[in-house]
């Protein structure tokens, strides 16, 4: 039980720090407008799956954001190492969060049902 609590707590700290690093330290224009939604940690804290969303719906912007995040991974890990007191900084995997678009699609379908 305590291990699950620790993974959640470390995930919340990484989420907060990565958002701040993206705003203040990463100068890549491809990651402008990227917001970290959630971080899921592996049980041994070796890997962090970072879920993000972007303001644009264009596929090209999504692809550019993914590439920009992958290029900035070294900078992000270095800053995490400076700011967090962890034995080992986890490997970061960035995944686009599709839940918002999925929710919008369902909402639109429900509105179309009301019209018919």
Swiss-Prot record:
GO (cellular component) term, any one = cytosol
Q: Which Gene3D superfamilies is this protein grouped with?
A: 3.30.300.20
| PROSITE patterns for the chain | RBFA
Instruction: Output the GO biological process annotations, alphabetical, semicolon-separated.
Output: maturation of SSU-rRNA
GO: which molecular function terms?
ribosomal small subunit binding
What the entry lists under SUPFAM superfamilies is as follows: Ribosome-binding factor A, RbfA
Q: Where in the cell is it found?
A: Cytoplasm
What keywords does the record list, in alphabetical order? Cytoplasm, Ribosome biogenesis
Q: Where mainly located?
A: cytoplasm
State whether it acts alone or in a complex, and with which partners, per the record: Monomer. Binds 30S ribosomal subunits, but not 50S ribosomal subunits or 70S ribosomes.
Q: Which family does it belong to?
A: Belongs to the RbfA family.
Its biological function?
A: One of several proteins that assist in the late maturation steps of the functional core of the 30S ribosomal subunit. Associates with free 30S ribosomal subunits (but not with 30S subunits that are part of 70S ribosomes or polysomes). Required for efficient processing of 16S rRNA. May interact with the 5'-terminal helix region of 16S rRNA.
- Return the protein name: Ribosome-binding factor A
